[in-house]
C-alpha cells in the first residue's frame, strides 16, 4: 500500500513531459524530488520511482505499474517518501505485492508499520558469524553440500531441471521444522506457481509462520526489481526488532538481475558484457549484503538461480556465485537419467564442508563419496567405448559403488507426491551418512542398483527386498495351486 510518511510535506506537483514504455520524464517547477522518491499520477493508478535527475527541473523515473493510459501533460504528485513495505506481526500468514497490498483476499491489515525498502546493510561491527549446519532432510545436500545457518545458498540450473521443485521441497521440509519466520519472495516467476505454492503451504498448515510476497513475470520491470528489497525489509524487521531467525526463500534471483537489465536499457545506459547492465555487481550486492547475521538473529537465504542456456560462465551466474556460502548445481544430464533431485555432486560445493565444522566422520565420508563419483566419471568414456567388462576387478567394484551411491542420493519428494504417486521421504543426516558408509563398504553389492532408487533410509532396501521376495513366493504358490486344480 502506498503510504505518505508521518511528517507533513507541502504538496509538490509536476507534469509528464515524456513517456517511453516504463520510463517517464517529469518536470517539477518548484521542488525537484530526490532519488528513490515515489510519485503518483493524479487521476489514475500509476506509480513511478525516481531513478535520475536529468537537470534542475526534470526527473526520470521507472513505472512500478503498467503505464497504459499515461500521457504527456498529466499531473504527477510527489508522495513525500520512498517505496515502503509493511512490517509487524500482522503480516504473518499473508501474501503481498511489491506495494505491500494484500493479494490473498484476506482482511485488511491492522497494527503494521511502514518502512522504506531502501535500507543499508548491517555494519561490520553489527554482524555475527556462526558455523552451524542447517539440515534440510534431503540426502545429497546434507551429506555433500551442507548448508549454513545464517548463510546464503544458491540453486543453479537451466530451464526445466527442477529448481522450483527443489525449492518447494526445501520449503516443505524446513518450514515445518524451522522455529523462526519463513519469507518466500517470488521474483519474475509464473503466477500459477505462486498460487499453487500458497495453496500447498495452507494445506500443509505452515502459513502461520510464513509470509509471501510476489512480483511476478507479468509485472513491469520496476516491480520485479523492487520486490526483493521489500521482502528483505520484512526479514530485517523479524531479525532486528523481534530477534527471530528468518528463512528467506527467493525464486528467482536471475529475474532480479534481468529486471535491472531491462531498467538499465530503458534508462539509456550503455550495456556491458552480453547486454547486462554495467551496474549489475553493485545492484546485486545491495540486495545480497542485506542478508546477514547479527547478534539479534540470523537470515538464512536459499535462492533459485536460472542459468541461461546452461552457461555457468554467464555474468549473472558468476556474480551470484561470489555471494554464496553454498552452491547447489543442478545437472540436465542427471535429470535426463531420472536421477532426481538432479544435483551434480562434483560441481556443487559448500564452505561448510570442512572437518572442523561438520566433524571428521562426516567430512571423511563426503570426501570418499566425491572420490568414488569422480573416479566413476573418469571411467565413463572407457565404459562407453569398451564396455564394463574391460575394466579390472577393482574398477568394476568402484563403478558398482558409484552407481549405487547415485541411486541412493535420489529421493521421493513430498511436493511431487501427486505427480509421481511415490510417498515423500524426509531423511535425517545420521541415516544419510549411515547409508553412504554401508554402500562404500559393499554391503549392498549383491542387491540390484534399482533397489536403492527413490528410497529414504538405506534400510528400506532390505525391507523392500523381503517384501518383493514374499510377493514372488506368494505368486509362485498361487500359480502352483492353479496348476494342480
From Swiss-Prot:
Under the heading CDD domains, the entry gives:
ATP-synt_F1_beta_C, F1-ATPase_beta_CD
Q: Which InterPro entries match?
A: AAA+_ATPase, Alt_ATPase_F1_bsu, ATP-synt_VA_C, ATP_synth_F1_bsu, ATPase_a/bsu_AS, ATPase_alpha/beta_chains, ATPase_F1/V1/A1_a/bsu_N, ATPase_F1/V1/A1_a/bsu_N_sf
User: Which EC number(s) does UniProt give?
Assistant: 7.1.2.2
List the catalysed reactions.
ATP + H2O + 4 H(+)(in) = ADP + phosphate + 5 H(+)(out)
Under PROSITE patterns, the record lists: ATPASE_ALPHA_BETA
Bilayer topology: Peripheral membrane protein
The places in or outside the cell where this protein is found are:
Cell inner membrane
- Primary location class: membrane
Record's keyword terms, sorted: ATP synthesis, ATP-binding, Cell inner membrane, Cell membrane, CF(1), Hydrogen ion transport, Ion transport, Membrane, Nucleotide-binding, Translocase, Transport
Q: Name one GO cellular component term.
A: proton-transporting ATP synthase complex
Recorded GO molecular functions are: ATP binding; ATP hydrolysis activity; proton-transporting ATP synthase activity, rotational mechanism; proton-transporting ATPase activity, rotational mechanism
The family note in this entry says: Belongs to the ATPase alpha/beta chains family.
Q: How does it assemble?
A: F-type ATPases have 2 components, CF(1) - the catalytic core - and CF(0) - the membrane proton channel. CF(1) has five subunits: alpha(3), beta(3), gamma(1), delta(1), epsilon(1). CF(0) has three main subunits: a(1), b(2) and c(9-12). The alpha and beta chains form an alternating ring which encloses part of the gamma chain. CF(1) is attached to CF(0) by a central stalk formed by the gamma and epsilon chains, while a peripheral stalk is formed by the delta and b chains.
Q: What does this protein do?
A: Produces ATP from ADP in the presence of a proton gradient across the membrane. The catalytic sites are hosted primarily by the beta subunits.
Q: State the protein's name.
A: ATP synthase subunit beta 1
Q: To which species is this protein native?
A: Psychromonas ingrahamii (strain DSM 17664 / CCUG 51855 / 37)
Q: Which gene encodes it?
A: atpD1
Amino acid at each position: 500500500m502506498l503510504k505518505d510518511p508521518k511528517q507533513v510535506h507541502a504538496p509538490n506537483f509536476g507534469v509528464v513531459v515524456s513517456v517511453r514504455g516504463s520510463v517517464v520524464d517529469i518536470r517539477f517547477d518548484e521542488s525537484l524530488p530526490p532519488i528513490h522518491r515515489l510519485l503518483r499520477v493524479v487521476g489514475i493508478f500509476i506509480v513511478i520511482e525516481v531513478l535520475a535527475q536529468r537537470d534542475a527541473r526534470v526527473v526520470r523515473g521507472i513505472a512500478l505499474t503498467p503505464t497504459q493510459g499515461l500521457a504527456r501533460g498529466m499531473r504527477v504528485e510527489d508522495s513525500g517518501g520512498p517505496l515502503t513495505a509493511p512490517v509487524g506481526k500482522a503480516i504473518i500468514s499473508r501474501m503481498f505485492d511489491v506495494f505491500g497490498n494484500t493479494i490473498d483476499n484476506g482482511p485488511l491489515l491492522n497494527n503494521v508499520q511502514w518502512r522504506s525498502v531502501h535500507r543499508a546493510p548491517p555494519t561490520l561491527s553489527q554482524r555475527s558469524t556462526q558455523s552451524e549446519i542447517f539440515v534440510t532432510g534431503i540426502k545429497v545436500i546434507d551429506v555433500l553440500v551442507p548448508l549454513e545457518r545464517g548463510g546464503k545458498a544458491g540453486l543453479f540450473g537451466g530451464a526445466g531441471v527442477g529448481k522450483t521443485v527443489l525449492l518447494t521441497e526445501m520449503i516443505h521440509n524446513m518450514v515445518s521444522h524451522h522455529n523462526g519466520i519463513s519469507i518466500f519472495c517470488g521474483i519474475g516467476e509464473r503466477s500459477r506457481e505462486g498460487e499453487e505454492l500458497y495453496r500447498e503451504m495452507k494445506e500443509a498448515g505452515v502459513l502461520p509462520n510464513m509470509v509471501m510476497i510476489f512480483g511476478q513475470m507479468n509485472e513491469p520491470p520496476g516491480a520485479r526489481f523492487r520486490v526483493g528489497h521489500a521482502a528483505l525489509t520484512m526479514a530485517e524487521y523479524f531479525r532486528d526488532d523481534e530477534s527471530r531467525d528468518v528463512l528467506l526463500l527467493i525464486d528467482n534471483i536471475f529475474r532480479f538481475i534481468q529486471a535491472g537489465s531491462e531498467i538499465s536499457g530503458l534508462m539509456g545506459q550503455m550495456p556491458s558484457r552480453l547486454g547486462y547492465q554495467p551496474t549489475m555487481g553493485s545492484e546485486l550486492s545491495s540486495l545480497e549484503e542485506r542478508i546477514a547475521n547479527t547478534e539479534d538473529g540470523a537470515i538464512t537465504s536459499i535462492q533459485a538461480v536460472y542459468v541461461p542456456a546452461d552457461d555457468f560462465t554467464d555474468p549473472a551466474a558468476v556474480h551470484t556465485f561470489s555471494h554464496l556460502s553454498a552452491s547447489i548445481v543442478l545437472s540436465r544430464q542427471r535429470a535426463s537419467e531420472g536421477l532426481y533431485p538432479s544435483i551434480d555432486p562434483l560441481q556443487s560445493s559448500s564452505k561448510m564442508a570442512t572437518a572442523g565444522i561438520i566433524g571428521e566422520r562426516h567430512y571423511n565420508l563426503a570426501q570418499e563419496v566425491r572420490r568414488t563419483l569422480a573416479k566413476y566419471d573418469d571411467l565413463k568414456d572407457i565404459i562407453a567405448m569398451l564396455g564394463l567388462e574391460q575394466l579390472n576387478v577393482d574398477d568394476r567394484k568402484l563403478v558398482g559403488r558409484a552407481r549405487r551411491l547415485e541411486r541412493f542420493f535420489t529421493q521421493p519428494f513430498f511436493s511431487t507426491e501427486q505427480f509421481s504417486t511415490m510417498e515423500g521421504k524426509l531423511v535425517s543426516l545420521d541415516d544419510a551418512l549411515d547409508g553412504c558408509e554401508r554402500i562404500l563398504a559393499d554391503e549392498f553389492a549383491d542387491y540390484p542398483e534399482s533397489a536403492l532408487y527413490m528410497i529414504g533410509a538405506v534400510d528400506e532396501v532390505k525391507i523392500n527386498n523381503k517384501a518383493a521376495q514374499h510377493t514372488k513366493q506368494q505368486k509362485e504358490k498361487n500359480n502352483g495351486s492353479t496348476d494342480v486344480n
